[in-house]
Amino acid sequence: MGLPWYRVHTVVLNDPGRLIAVHLMHTALVAGWAGSMALYELAVFDPSDPVLNPMWRQGMFVMPFMARLGVTDSWGGWSITGESVSNPGLWSFEGVALTHIVLSGMLFLAAIWHWVYWDLELFRDPRTGEPALDLPKIFGIHLLLSSLLCFGFGAFHVTGLFGPGMWVSDGYGVTGKVLPVAPAWGPEGFNPFNPGGVASHHIAAGTVGILAGVFHLTVRPPQRLYRALRMGNIETVLSSSISAVFFSAFVTCGTMWYGSATTPIELFGPTRYQWDSGYFQQEIEKRVENAIADGAAPSEAWSRIPDKLAFYDYIGNNPAKGGLFRAGPMNKGDGVAEAWLGHPVFQDKEGRELSVRRMPAFFETFPVILVDKDGIIRADIPFRRAESKYSIEQVGVTASFYGGKLNGQVFNDAPSVKKYARKAQLGEVFEFDRTTLESDGVFRSSPRGWFTFGHANFALIFFFGHLWHGSRTIFRDVFAGIGAEVTEQVEFGAFQKLGDRSSKKQGAV
């Protein structure tokens, strides 16, 4: 037919067999990519330190999605929680990856079969003998099947009745593990950070969808509605499907970027708003204050802070710090975290306790300023020494460490104090290995940032696709150029293929 590249999908119009074939092939590609990507990530993933080198620091993309559904173990004998496992069986990273690849192969063969055997009796209207699809009935079938799956996921998989449950953690991402979840049927179920809402909403949505599917299978649409919504046109199906996809993409952008029960920070990394609001900093300070109030010494109180919690309170783990054109995992930026050095407390020669003002998310450089408890600037690292009044040397600042690798150490020399003041500007102080991965010192974003950026773009493109195909199906007669001066016209709805000589024609009246 000599179609241009952007019109090639015309070949599956009014060809139900090959329409099924291309959908089978598309699903095969998706399943094959998912399985192959999982195997690739497993090949490069280092499970040795789940606290300071978790999967989101290593740039893993599909593994966090597997883990949140309950896949945490590997045939290699490790678990993402740091434990040793034996015989994880099929419900493991490798097992799930291989089942997707096997599924992909079977779908590939099915696609070929349907491409070859495209002209089935099933696709012909018994009254006319012409190709026809009962699209409202097909909609009912799809709605019923997807709703059964939705209900089953909420009622069995998430609740643990027949399945592992889902990833559940505390509000600070320290104690996460896979647990069965009880449905939350009250107002608390609408809290996006409550995993109980995942179970209850899938059960509720599945129930409504099953009823709606049965309705669409048993009740025919009114003729006026059928014509008004162009229910007989396959491009209507395409347009409405695209709208469902772009809406889902927009929603997942929000749940990923702002955080939710389905995007736990242990699997995808912290959100930028947790850095902006000092979320982890406040929790750490509260825990330290409570420990000191219970009689613990400051060094002991800080030593009780989990390394995992301290690591979240570091700007390099903020997904907004990585530029969109800086490819690679976080570890290729600041390096592989090796140890928490501890919490530095600065003092001037008058005994005032100073803290370093932290860098805001969207700054690449920021002045190093030390303030007292009242927010008054007492020391800094000056840009011009000649005019400095508050330099580390002039003010006589010292740095004392509590907790971590440097617990109990005090630094009096200005170069060391400046070094740790610069590090404290970025949150809690960590030691990084930048040699192993040849890390360049430039921050990268986490999978949370990449997912959001990608899906926001997909959603925008699909939004325009929805408008395009929706307009084409509603105003098809206008776009086709039907008018009084047209002497010969293709009869729409019989055959729409460009260049198809078998299309029925009618003369001008």
From Swiss-Prot:
Annotated Gene Ontology cellular component terms: chloroplast thylakoid membrane; photosystem II
MF-aspect GO terms: chlorophyll binding; electron transporter, transferring electrons within the cyclic electron transport pathway of photosynthesis activity
Q: How does it sit in the membrane?
A: Multi-pass membrane protein
Function, in words: One of the components of the core complex of photosystem II (PSII). It binds chlorophyll and helps catalyze the primary light-induced photochemical processes of PSII. PSII is a light-driven water:plastoquinone oxidoreductase, using light energy to abstract electrons from H(2)O, generating O(2) and a proton gradient subsequently used for ATP formation.
TM segment ranges: 21-36, 101-115, 140-156, 203-218, 237-252, 457-472
* HAMAP family assigned: PSII_PsbB_CP47
Keyword Chloroplast (UniProt): yes
Quaternary structure and partners: PSII is composed of 1 copy each of membrane proteins PsbA, PsbB, PsbC, PsbD, PsbE, PsbF, PsbH, PsbI, PsbJ, PsbK, PsbL, PsbM, PsbT, PsbX, PsbY, PsbZ, Psb30/Ycf12, at least 3 peripheral proteins of the oxygen-evolving complex and a large number of cofactors. It forms dimeric complexes.
Query: What is the protein name for this chain?
Result: Photosystem II CP47 reaction center protein
Q: InterPro entries recorded for this chain?
A: PS_antenna-like, PS_II_antenna-like_sf, PSII_PsbB
Q: What is the lineage of its organism?
A: Eukaryota, Rhodophyta, Bangiophyceae, Bangiales, Bangiaceae
Q: State a single Pfam family of this protein.
A: PSII
Q: Does the keyword Plastid apply?
A: yes
